[in-house]
Regions:
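N-terminal charged segments
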Residues: 1-73
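Short amphipathic alpha-helix that is part of the acyltransferase structural core
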Residues: 1-18, 56-61, 108-111, 115-155, ...
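Acyl-donor-binding surface of acyltransferase catalytic domains
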Residues: 21-22, 60-127, 132-134, 228, ...
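A short helix-loop-beta-strand connector motif used in the catalytic cores of GNAT acetyltransferases and
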Residues: 27-34, 76-78, 105-108, 160-170, ...
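Conserved beta-hairpin
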Residues: 34-39, 89-103, 166-179
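A conserved beta-turn-beta hairpin within the catalytic core of GNAT-like acetyltransferases
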Residues: 45, 49-56, 105, 185-193, ...
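Conserved acetyl-CoA-binding loop-helix of GNAT-fold acetyltransferases
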Residues: 64-69, 194-197, 203-220, 243
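A conserved beta-strand-loop-helix scaffold within acyl/acetyltransferase catalytic domains
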Residues: 149-199
Length: 297
């Protein structure tokens, strides 16, 4: 079990680092992308996008708290996650984070694993095919909207199209791309980082079909297991993604707790000028010991 947990963390770090580093230069500059590896930890930051998903620290231990918080603080980023595996709940790490004003986020994540084997009984009226480079704009827009990111972040999420280790698949409705999903592979492991469907194409089997396509590709490449994650169920909030993972054969692997500056919440950044607004917004300065409270939904 612990080996699988380590593998799931490792391939997630590798996939997102790969995407940040290999995105086109203009995208890296536009979003303020940076990746910093510190021992077993990886810091992913997008200084011009005020969104939790693109500003995260993975694999931080007790000796890495100062470096992780300092990375985001020095880059002027006030909204970020520091991920912590549930096995560290009773270590000194939570206390060290709280001392810096980094507190538990309301929703933890569940990491999932399943064999890299095809799905049975996949029915979808839409056409499923591998994504092409000229699909990039549509794929990026769908994925960005699916994760409440500004449209300018779309090129980052679609940056893996055509790159080695990455495979993207799309669902078409009369030649219009209406859903997209990606898979990153490395040796025995596959990682499914994101997928999304436009509202009008939901309830048509797109995501199950895209899952089948990705798992089939993982098996074709010789992968043994596939990893992914989604938010834990929270009372009063939708949890369809969690249920869908179980329906397609994923097993719960481990809970990952998320820590963020006090008051941070997920929020929607759909507007085309969101990045300009983010870049112009004042940022908190000084240490987090003062208990900075950030606005958000």
């Amino acid at each position: 079990m612990q080996q699988l947990i380590r593998r799931s963390e490792s391939i997630e770090r590798a996939a997102w680092s790969n995407l940040y580093r290999r995105a086109p230069w203009r995208v890296r500059r536009r979003l303020g992308l940076r990746v910093l590896d510190r021992g077993e930890a990886t810091f992913l930051s997008a200084s011009r996008v005020d969104h939790l998903l693109l500003n995260r620290a993975i694999g931080v231990g007790s000796d890495g708290v100062a470096a992780a918080v300092g990375h985001f603080e020095q880059r002027g980023i006030g909204r970020f996650w520091i991920h912590m595996g549930s096995e560290l709940r009773y270590s000194e790490l939570p206390g060290l984070l709280r001392e810096r004003g980094i507190t538990p986020y309301p929703r933890s994540w569940m990491k999932f694993v399943r064999p890299a084997a095809p799905l049975d009984e996949v029915k979808c009226a839409l056409r499923i095919r591998p994504a092409r480079r000229n699909d990039g704009a549509q794929v990026g827009e769908i994925l960005a909207r699916g994760f409440d990111l500004p449209t300018e972040a779309g090129p980052l999420l679609a940056a893996g199209i055509g790159l080695d280790q990455w495979d993207y698949f799309v669902a078409e409705d009369e030649r219009e791309v209406v859903a997209a999903a990606a898979i990153y592979t490395r040796g025995d492991d596959a990682y499914l980082p994101f997928a999304a469907t436009v509202p009008k194409a939901r309830q048509k089997g797109c995501q199950r079909a895209l899952m089948a396509a990705r798992l089939g590709r993982a098996q074709q490449l010789g992968c043994r297991q596939a990893f992914t994650e989604t938010g834990m169920p929270v009372a009063g909030e939708p949890s369809s993604s969690y249920r869908n993972m179980l329906r397609v054969g994923f097993d719960e692997l481990h809970v990952r707790d998320n820590f963020a500056p006090e008051g941070c919440r997920w929020h929607n950044l759909p507007s085309s000028d969101a990045i300009a607004k983010s870049a112009a917004s004042p940022r908190p300065s000084g240490t987090w010991l003062k208990g900075v409270v950030l606005s958000g939904s």
